[in-house]
Amino acid sequence: MVMVMRAPAGRMVGRDEELGRLLTLLDDAGSGRAVAALVSGDAGVGKSRLVSEVTRLADGRGFTVLSGQCAELGDSVPYLPLADALRGAAQSTGVRDALSSRPALGRLLPEGGEGPTIDSDRSGLARQQMFGGVLGLLAELAAAAPVLLVLEDLHWADGSTRDLVTFLSRMLHRERVALIGTYRTDDLHRRHPLRPVVAELQRLPSVISVDLAPLDPSALAEHLMAVAAPARIDAAELNDIVTRAEGNAYYAEELLAASLSGDLADHSTLPAGLAALLLSRVEQLSDATQQVLRAAAVAGSRADDELVRSASGLQAAEYEGAVREAVTHQLLVPYGTEGYVFRHALLREAVYADLLPGERTRLHATMCSLLSDEQRLTPPGTAAELAQHCLASHDIPGAFAASVRAGREAEQLGAPAEAHRHYDQALALWERVAEPEQTAGLARGKLGLLSAANSADSGDIEHAVHLLRRLRHLLTTPAGQAAGGKDVNLVSRIGERLAFYLMLMDDNKAIAEAVEVAQATVGAAPAEPATWQHARAIATYAYALLAEDSYAAAREWAERGLAAARAAGAPWVQADALVTMGILSNREGRNDEAIELLTAAHTQAREAKVLGVELRAAYHLARAHLERGDLSIGASVAHEGTKRANQTGLGLAPYGLDVQHLHFQCHFADGKWDHAQEIADGFPIRVTSAPEAYLSSMALFIDVARGNPAVAERRAWIEPFWSVRGFDGFIARGLLAEDALWRGDTDETLAEAAIAIDLAYEAPWGHNPSTIRPAVVALSARADRAAQARATGDDDTASAELAAAGELRQIAREGAAFAKRPKFILGPEGHGWLARAEAEYCRASGVNDPQAWQAVLDAFGPAYIYETARTQWRLAEALAEAGRRDEAAEQWRQAAHTADKLGARPLRRALDDLARRARIGAAQEHGDGEVLAALTSREREVLRLIAAGRSNREIASVLFIAPKTASVHVSNILGKLGAASRTEAAAIAYREGLSSQPSAR
């Protein structure tokens, strides 16, 4: 066995399918069928890394591995990769002996040998001897062990090597040989000599093509975190590198190394080595082509053909030739019908950074002049481009006007983050423009209000509050009168929005400030004539009083706001007031009245097309249904709210975020976990903002309950945001405590639960019902430890654990008592967890009481499917301990059915453990293949992939079948297994031992 290439460190990510195809190639070679693969991809995308992994695995399988690389030497050194491979492998006795009998190959070795010189390969006889010698060598080696021949970088191969690859691919048939060649697709221009060779080889039945696409963002991020370990990468920094690298592993690693070493001045610079590498391809081209590339780099990520032509200064014929050269060498790629993009964004960055300062300014000024034409400003996004070019060319008035226009365009497109950025830029330029109000068409106060509103709609509430505080202060100064301070309606709007956003910060000080600001806003605005601004200020004041728990005053002012809105003819403000009244009714226990009010508010807001109020109404309406156990109705309302939020770009806005979370929670609670998983999969893992971290924290509910491997990855990404939003940390730490409990790590359970409880106490209202769940999780860990101590006769430890359990029970009881305050509602789920605290305390005391667990079951009710199953597991255990085996078996059976249906693998493992210990339920160790006996071999293959979490399209790709065929197989499998879903089928596969790893989906 020969191992020429060094095995790379670490696990490959993002290349499972490609690796699987190449390993299948090794299987074919090992069984006596000669095969070949052409592995292609851009430079740096991971071809060598993939091939290194294949060679490592081939060596482990007993293959003789020969590996060589081409060099950028043209035809001056024939057979260079073959010589490289043979020189490395000649240390092996078997290879050396096989070479000694083939003098034609001798000259390829360092010590030389008999046979033709390298230069004489042009004669037909010498070529035949060389080709025949290689073929014979491979055949002889393959007789002893399978052979893997790897020839890398064939885009640099000499003509003789290209011909040899074609010859071997055609002549090898039944030899145990696999040939893998790699080449760069970005170097393969139309006249490249390898291009016809690839086309010819791809027609051969024994040759497969493996094209490496760029890594997807998640895979690239995972790869970079592994490369950086044990160092930690800032989430924003990592996201920036992943975005800039566009899936190219080498580029990403270079950016990461420069970032970790502090060599990057900012996120717009490139490491010197990487920049030089990228520019080396540009410097080989004609001067005209380089000028076109410079103009295209300044034009932006997508370069309009006419813009680039005009900016380049070239004549039409010269320009066309230059563009053709750039496209032929795959530096530019046609985009649509009227423009180009760089093959890779970092290439554009390198070309742009290489521009001289004056050259860069002049090109940007040219772009400004060209884009300022009104006809060119028609397509969406053009104003943003113009603003960028104006700034870069120091045209401040032009940049200001374009920024305002770009903000309006972004608003119309439902892109609040971009709108805020443009408006913020305009605000920064305001004092540098001669007549800003005339240029912008609005007062500074209105521009600031637009910026703040879009900041909030993109999820950045804190920045919106900061902007509005400054703006409100500005308008109260003499200079502020010119900024819009004389406009009482504008002042009212700014005060009202500031109060509203302050309440969303969920902080006692912020709420107190909100009440003060809202009260002052209502008092400063004239009641007559009736205006929607004044009516909305009243409605927001009512909402602030509600947040402060001043319920009587809140209802009074909400009714005033409703009357003022009617007088002003503002139905959407009426809806806003109705939402507050609905929340009040719900907190006062009048649930039917609350739902009626909230339904009316939701309808009015939707008819008025005011999305912010509509989403607020949708959230509270769905929550009211959820709290009284109407999960299906709550899910329906939340689903519609989620659709509206995402369709309009308000997914991270106030209530857009909350309604998404509620939509997920409804399906998680009612047992529709495949739907819940789909929603959770849409919650980003690679989070870069607090709102995204909030959603990712919510996804932990199902990831923990299903035992998904995403738990660890989500934790790594959301952890930096725990200090930004304490609530996110509270949710995550509580769920991580449950994850540790399922894994049997009670130390970690107690540590995480303690932090979650502390974070709940730090909430604005102190002791609250949020403490119940983490307290009960910790109580369960204490009960486990007490039981273990009693089993070993350690009475002192058992007593200590019981005392600690008592403290946790008291925390849960205090949380429930606090819920009696009007602000909180302890619905069926809350009562269920409180009852669980009592049952777990009984277990900690050594009395696992079936009646206590039955009380938990009754409290949750049938709507909470998963919690019911978890409770049935404990009830079955208690019944078994009490000797009531038949009842225990029935509870166990129901819980096991639910666990399989949901794909709740940790619960299923706990149930299987109980079945073995208590000998209840149908034994889960089925006879070998008993349940799967009805499946064909192909269906078993498909089921393995289902259990691995693969989609129908992915299954089709792995098994080389059509997606429609994969769909038919999946349907047949579900029918034969009696499974209601893919998740249930995956659980069966795992239980039956067909899958060694549970599905992540």
Q: Which positions does each model-derived feature cover?
A:
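Short secondary-structure boundary elements
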Residues: 45, 84, 215, 219-421, ...
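Extended alpha-helical scaffolding segments used for macromolecular assembly and cargo binding
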Residues: 36, 50-54, 250, 302, ...
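Conserved Walker-type P-loop NTP-binding/catalytic site
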Residues: 2, 80-148, 199-202, 206, ...
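Helix-turn-helix DNA-binding segment
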Residues: 916, 923-980, 984-987, 991-1001
